[in-house]
Design a protein with these regions (language model features):
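Conserved acetyl-CoA-binding loop of GNAT-fold acetyltransferases
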Residues: 120-130
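Short amphipathic alpha-helix that is part of the acyltransferase structural core
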Residues: 1-26
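Conserved N-terminal entry element of GNAT/NAT acetyltransferase domains
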Residues: 1-7, 149-158
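Conserved acyl-donor/pantetheine-binding loop and adjacent beta-alpha core of acyl/acetyltransferases
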Residues: 48-71, 79, 134-138
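Conserved acetyl-CoA-binding loop-helix of GNAT-fold acetyltransferases
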Residues: 77, 81-96, 118-122
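Conserved GNAT acetyl-CoA-binding A-motif
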Residues: 95-111
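Active-site rim helix/loop that mediates acceptor-substrate recognition in acyltransferases
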Residues: 20-42
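Conserved beta-strand-loop-alpha-helix junction that forms the acyl-donor binding cleft
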Residues: 77-79, 106-117, 133-139
């Protein structure tokens, strides 16, 4: 697994353009910016764009991503050969190894994107909340995975 390099940006952008229906807002500038910040991984035709939060952020109706939590913003692959799961699990290991990251990974996905939701569930992500975009017009689901130790104590109801 490796971080994307600036020379990868055109290839990555073309991959997103092929999936414009799912990723309508991805621009070349966004990709280039994330590459410069080392928030973009590109390996075996799989792109993962992520961020380690520097402050608490509301990401679901009832869910907040805490400082040092990871948010997986986008994952896209050019093949349906298992490389997506393989690279995603290597990404989980990478986040788990970072001393400055909590080990909690969140992502949100459109509620009607059944293919992506099955993919995340196959990779042991848990549906934890709902969200919406576009002033409530687009419904979404929030998933979470914990890759460091037993963090359940932080998520038990009061």
């Amino acid at each position: 697994m490796r971080f994307a390099r600036e020379e990868d940006s055109t290839e990555i952008y073309e991959l997103y353009k092929k999936n414009r229906k799912i990723f309508p807002n991805i621009t070349m500038g966004h990709i280039t910016n994330r590459i410069k910040k080392r928030e973009c991984i590109y390996t075996e035709g799989v792109v993962i764009i992520f961020r380690i939060h520097q402050k608490t952020v509301q990401i679901g109706d009832n869910t907040k991503s805490q400082k040092s939590d990871c948010v997986l913003n986008q994952i896209v692959t050019s093949f349906s050969n298992g490389s997506g799961s393989r690279i995603l699990n290597r990404f989980f290991d990478y986040i788990g190894s970072l001393p400055h990251a909590s080990g909690v990974i969140h992502l949100s996905v459109r509620s009607d994107n059944d293919r992506a939701k099955k993919f995340f569930e196959r990779n042991e992500m848990e549906l934890v909340d709902k969200t919406s975009w576009g002033k409530g017009k687009i419904e979404g689901d929030v998933y979470r995975k914990m890759v460091k130790g037993d963090l359940d104590m932080f998520f038990t109801p009061p």
